[in-house]
From Swiss-Prot:
This is Homoserine O-acetyltransferase. It comes from Mycobacterium avium (strain 104). Keywords: Acyltransferase, Amino-acid biosynthesis, Cytoplasm, Methionine biosynthesis, Transferase. It is found in: Cytoplasm. Its EC number is 2.3.1.31. GO terms for cellular component: cytoplasm. InterPro entries: AB_hydrolase_1, AB_hydrolase_fold, HAT_MetX-like. The gene is metXA. It catalyses: L-homoserine + acetyl-CoA = O-acetyl-L-homoserine + CoA.
């Protein structure tokens, strides 16, 4: 992967969104994406020695807006509000939290809805990308900001896949990591469910081969169906049955064409996503998840994991049916730097990494202890040595 040198740029003001130009990016597969911009936000001050950066990596339909209210450029409030801020697990009195919108996304970073130099949206011309490409773009953006090494990378789901690629592909650039609700590679079950979501979008007549952006017709129905199916994999089976059972939606009768309560709930989730997300980005990012394999071109998963020295905390959720606990157990067993496998007992399924704030906050705090930084924040004196870890 080739990323040309670019001039150093400046971090945006706290909580504001900035756009870092990284030039052209050559993907793992050899495609060239010209004129790439990566959206960046930060909370907390960068220390003089630039040693206190914690990179927060979002999941599939997330963005750089980790914390804070909705506003211009942010159609929703922060997706991990309780994790970042003064006194929070990522304590911004000490750490500088930095988040990007992933390459291929639709919240400020270059993706299918972005316009190319010819003034037209990328659309179907946007190439397939991998999780590895996303990480390379993030690293290039940070380098343009003068940040060559980070204290930690933390992320769940697709963010966890990005964190894993960070530590395996660039162990000298990161001092610790939190790998949450993720595995070393995509499983057949994940690929199957995710390919079905892509098919739902592409079967919408308004998809138009991916070149719909300037036509006034968007594949909203296909995207909503994809989200409904995906949302089932995000929540726990027991949780859904406890909340909805086989109940009818209020004032409706399924026997007479009405809806079930769970059906109404899933339709609502689909509508919410359509209001804030681009179908082309959903396809591109889902394809990247399908191709996730940390062992690709590294001698296989086992060799790739066992060669990674970075201290990590691995977190899993008992009811996660998208990334079952066995996948986190594999990471914990194969990563030499794994200090702890933390298992969250939750009925909330995969989304437990977003809603089980107390347990996730504890994992983040332990990860930052592993980072070994003795920086006191903006006036700190620089990092200490990495702390020793024990295998679980």
């Amino acid at each position: 992967m080739t990323i040309p040198d670019v001039p150093t740029q400046t971090l945006p003001d706290e909580g504001e969104i900035g756009f870092v130009h990284i030039g052209s990016l050559t993907t793992e597969a050899g495609a060239v994406i010209d004129d790439v911009h990566i959206a960046v936000q930060r909370w907390g001050e960068l220390s003089p020695t630039r040693d206190n950066v914690v990179v927060v990596l979002h999941a599939l339909t997330g963005d750089s807006h980790v914390t804070g209210p909705a506003g211009p450029g942010h159609p929703t409030g922060g997706w991990w509000d309780e994790m970042v801020g003064p006194g929070a697990p990522i304590d911004t009195d000490r750490w500088c939290a930095v988040a990007t919108n992933v390459l291929g996304g639709c919240r400020g970073s270059t993706g299918p809805s972005s316009r190319t130099r010819d003034g037209k949206p990328w659309g179907s011309r946007f190439p397939r990308i991998s999780i590895r490409d996303q990480v390379e773009a993030d690293i290039a953006a940070l380098a343009a900001l003068g940040i060559d090494e980070v204290a930690a990378v933390v992320g769940g789901s697709m963010g966890g896949a990005r964190a894993l690629e960070w530590i395996v592909g660039h162990p000298s650039r990161v001092r610790a990591g939190l790998l949450l609700a993720v595995g070393a590679r995509a499983t057949a079950d994940q690929i199957g469910t995710q390919c079905t979501q892509i098919a739902a979008i592409k079967s919408d007549p308004n998809w138009q081969g991916g070149d719909y952006h300037d036509t006034g017709r968007t594949p909203d129905a296909g995207l909503a169906i994809a989200r409904r199916f995906a949302h089932l994999t995000y929540r726990g089976e027991v949780e859904l049955d406890t909340r909805f059972g086989n109940d009818a939606q209020l004032d409706e009768d399924p026997a007479n064409g009405g809806r079930y309560a769970v059906q109404s709930y899933l339709e609502y989730q689909g509508v919410k996503l359509v209001e804030r997300f681009d179908a082309g980005s959903y396809v591109v990012l889902t394809e990247a998840l399908n191709s996730h394999d940390v062992g690709r071109a590294r001698g296989g998963v086992r060799k790739a994991l066992r060669s990674c020295p970075v201290p990590v905390v691995v977190g899993g959720i008992t009811s996660d049916r998208l990334y079952p606990l066995r996948l986190q157990q594999e990471l914990a067993e194969q990563l030499p730097g794994c200090a702890e496998l933390q298992v969250v007992d939750s009925i909330c399924g995969h989304d437990g990494f977003l809603v089980e704030s107390e347990a996730v906050g504890e994992m983040i705090r332990k990860t930052l202890l592993l980072a070994g930084s003795q920086s006191a924040g903006p006036g700190g004196a620089g990092p200490g040595s990495r702390k020793g870890t024990t295998r679980r």
